[in-house]
């Protein structure tokens, strides 16, 4: 058990240095000039993790409360990826009270190299908060391979979502040029026309070479059908969490 724990710690904070297929130093400085995706980052991650099974990998999730639940879609996605790749995986959840991560939680085991999953989902916070705390959300000794961005509900509804994420995206590309970025188009909010804020989001991200996982389209938009899938006006209920899990895992070509 001690050996396993040590392996998981290594997986949480360390990853190999590699050249990502869709990121480079130029993109870090001028993200709007990125070329369209040739292969989705999620599939590239899975293929690379299979091809180099002994090498550790690191995933980072930055976002709001929709990804923060300890029994929600994010850890479920982690467990499914761990099982598919036969890699041990551990995660830490961000705490907005301490502005730091909590204790490590194991998500799976396996004989191959470990995967660390930093869940920087911060309830009630926006992309600017992630930018301000980036040096703690992605510790100095971590080298992320895949960074998922899950923002929308806490952003300014009067400003295009893609525009609001630009400062964070630019900083991520500057600091982590070898990491692939993935943006999640969040599920609808009850009583709000979130479609207006996210209009053009997918095309804007695609133009920058950032894959979009479309959770929004997996949900109904009318309030009556949406209500059972939310535990409040925004955050998914257990049934909604399952839709999130299934949709995100499809992007990795992993069964829920």
Where are these regions (language model features)?
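Alpha-helical scaffolding within the catalytic cores
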Residues: 40-48, 101-105, 127-139, 162-171, ...
């Amino acid at each position: 058990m001690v050996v396993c724990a040590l392996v998981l710690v290594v997986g949480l904070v360390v990853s190999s240095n590699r050249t990502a297929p869709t990121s480079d130093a130029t993109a870090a400085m001028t993200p709007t000039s990125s070329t369209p995706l040739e292969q989705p980052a999620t599939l590239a991650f899975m293929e690379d993790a299979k091809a180099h099974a002994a090498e550790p990998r690191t995933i980072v999730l930055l976002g709001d409360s929709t990804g923060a639940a300890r029994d929600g879609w994010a850890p479920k996605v982690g467990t499914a990826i761990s099982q598919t790749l036969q890699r041990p995986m551990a995660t830490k959840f961000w705490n907005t009270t301490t502005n730091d991560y909590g204790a490590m939680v194991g998500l799976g085991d396996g004989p191959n190299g470990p995967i660390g999953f930093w869940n920087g989902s911060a309830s009630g916070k926006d992309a600017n908060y992630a930018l301000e705390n980036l040096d703690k959300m992605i510790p100095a000794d971590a080298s992320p391979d895949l960074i998922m961005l899950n923002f929308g509900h806490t952003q300014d509804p009067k400003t295009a979502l893609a525009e609001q994420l630009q400062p964070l995206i630019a900083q991520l590309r500057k600091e982590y040029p070898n990491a692939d970025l993935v943006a999640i188009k969040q599920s609808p909010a009850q009583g709000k026309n979130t479609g207006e804020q996210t209009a053009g989001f997918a095309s804007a991200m695609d133009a920058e070479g950032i894959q979009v996982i479309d959770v929004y389209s997996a949900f109904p938009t009318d309030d009556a059908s949406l209500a059972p899938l939310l535990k409040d006006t925004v955050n998914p209920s257990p049934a909604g969490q399952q839709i999130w899990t299934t949709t995100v895992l499809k992007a990795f070509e992993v069964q829920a």
